[in-house]
């Protein structure tokens, strides 16, 4: 278990996430907040959204309304600097669950004004013409990273990166930048702004050696327990590292693993009970949701959703409902 007494954050630090477009992301953002609160109860959290603030009641310190009409979807993150109420910000996608204290992430970016976690490579598949990119943005390497996590401080350097990214964004098609699922992708633009600022990606590890990586660990086995703070990846029977968080991208949002962990978080925060009997019941319910492809816990956060879960569990126990 992690020693929570070692947690430390920069002054004015907080965590930011964005929820728009898909309403199920509201419930995922709440699951994200719960996973953070388990280990960082005093770290301020903010959500920027165009949904009803009541969906986030009690879990976020700031619920910030925002107009997303100019954005296709992912590219709304180019507004992160303007959105954040914090002096030092960790941005996390709503479909992430956190397994360790985020103090490790602050350690990773200590001294930085802006940062991402990934790899510095010579060629990127994000652009139709690397020759064009090299002419416009000459560099030996380019940052390859997943946009599930960003770090930035309120500073001239970070402000300049986001300002430059906005101007590059206007040339998205001219620069022959590929879209992601028909939407413009912010990390492909921020990558180019980082080149001009001379900023490289951090490797997936912090000062204490934990993996900070928003890419899903393909080909690895993951042992995870969000309530106990366990997230270990192994490959061919060998431990490859302990992860600070997992990013349930794409179809992983509706996977059994995500459903089960989210249900456990909801149950623990609402009822404070845990144990093998509860886990067994929640495993059955998560399997039911996954097999039916009806993520019922996503439909609506609040009393209705919890009552549905409670009623379903009672039915499975043969106790009827009340």
Task: Give the label of every model feature segment.
Residues 50-84:
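Active-site-proximal specificity loops/subdomain of glycosyltransferases
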Residues 42-51:
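Short, hydrophobic beta-strand segments that form beta-sheet elements in well-ordered domains
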Residues 35-43:
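Short, acidic, metal-binding catalytic loop of nucleotide-sugar glycosyltransferases
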Residues 2-12, 159-322:
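A glycosyltransferase accessory/donor-loop signature
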Residues 108-168:
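Conserved catalytic core of nucleotide-sugar-dependent glycosyltransferases
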Residues 1-27:
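N-proximal low-complexity "stem/linker" segments adjacent to membrane-targeting elements
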Residues 80, 149-151, 245:
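Conserved hydrophobic/aromatic beta-strand scaffold that supports enzyme active sites
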Residues 73-126:
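GT-A fold catalytic core of metal-dependent nucleotide-sugar glycosyltransferases
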């Amino acid at each position: 278990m992690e020693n929570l007494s070692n947690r430390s954050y920069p002054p004015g630090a907080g965590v930011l996430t964005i929820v728009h477009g898909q309403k199920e992301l509201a419930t995922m953002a709440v699951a994200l907040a719960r996973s953070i609160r388990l280990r960082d109860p005093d770290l301020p959290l903010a959500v920027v959204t165009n949904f009803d603030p009541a969906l986030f009641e009690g879990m976020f310190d700031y619920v910030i309304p925002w107009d997303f009409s100019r954005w296709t979807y992912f590219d709304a993150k180019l507004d992160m600097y303007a959105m954040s109420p914090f002096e030092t910000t960790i941005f996390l996608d709503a479909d992430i669950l956190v397994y360790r204290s985020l103090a490790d992430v602050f350690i990773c970016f200590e001294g930085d004004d802006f940062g991402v976690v990934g790899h510095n490579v010579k060629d990127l598949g994000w652009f139709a013409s690397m020759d064009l990119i090299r002419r416009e943005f000459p560099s030996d390497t380019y940052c390859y990273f997943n946009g599930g996590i960003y770090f930035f401080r309120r500073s001239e350097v970070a402000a300049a990166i986001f300002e430059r990214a906005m101007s590059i964004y206007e040339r998205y098609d001219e620069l022959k930048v590929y879209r992601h699922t028909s939407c413009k992708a912010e990390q492909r633009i921020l990558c180019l702004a980082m080149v001009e600022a001379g900023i490289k990606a951090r490797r997936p590890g912090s000062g204490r050696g934990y993996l900070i990586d928003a890419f899903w660990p393909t080909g690895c086995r993951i042992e995870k327990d969000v309530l106990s703070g366990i997230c270990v990846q192994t490959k061919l029977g060998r431990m490859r590292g302990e992860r600070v968080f997992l990013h349930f991208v794409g179809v992983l949002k509706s996977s059994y693993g995500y459903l089960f962990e989210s249900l456990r978080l909801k149950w623990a925060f609402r009822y404070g009970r845990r144990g093998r009997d509860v886990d067994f019941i929640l495993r059955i319910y998560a399997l039911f949701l996954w097999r039916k492809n009806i993520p019922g816990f996503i439909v609506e956060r609040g009393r209705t959703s919890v009552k549905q879960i409670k009623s379903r569990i009672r039915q499975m126990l043969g106790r009827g409902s009340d």
